[in-house]
């Protein structure tokens, strides 16, 4: 069984990863990567995911440590760096990397869902709709992955 504190750390780690994805898509839009409409839609989804996760974090009375906030800032900037590099790649290769990254994101959220189901003292899980939100995020990340897979061909 997973304790509340272990879950909290996993949850915050997921938020930090989402922050890097936001940086990547922001950079690609800045460098006018095409198809712009797809990148903009996915960026909006990633921002929404992060907002939902942070809202849940605060609803639990949790907060970020200074180190976690610093890591979030670092990840946003590293996302910009990665996104800038991706912008220089041929489109199909760029789309392949996005396909793999979105697939990995869906797997990470799936791991988070498994952690929720293995937490000791699950009263708060039943009183919130976090499982529904995470399932929607998983479906969304899988959809992003499929979009990029289609763009590869």
What are these regions (language model features)?
Residues 1-153:
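Non-heme di-metal
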């Amino acid at each position: 069984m997973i304790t509340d504190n272990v879950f909290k750390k996993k949850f915050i780690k997921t938020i930090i990863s989402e922050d890097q994805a936001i940086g990547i898509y922001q950079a690609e839009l800045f460098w006018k990567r095409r198809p712009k409409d797809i990148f903009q839609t996915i960026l909006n989804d990633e921002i929404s995911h992060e907002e939902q996760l942070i809202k849940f974090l605060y609803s639990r009375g949790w907060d970020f440590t200074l180190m976690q906030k610093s890591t979030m800032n670092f990840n946003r900037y590293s996302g910009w760096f990665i996104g800038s590099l991706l912008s220089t790649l041929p489109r199909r290769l760029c789309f392949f990397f996005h396909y793999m990254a979105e697939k990995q994101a869906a797997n990470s959220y799936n791991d988070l869902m498994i952690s929720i189901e293995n937490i000791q003292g699950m009263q708060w899980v039943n009183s919130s709709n976090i499982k529904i939100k995470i399932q929607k995020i998983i479906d969304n990340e899988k959809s992003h992955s499929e979009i990029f897979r289609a763009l590869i061909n």
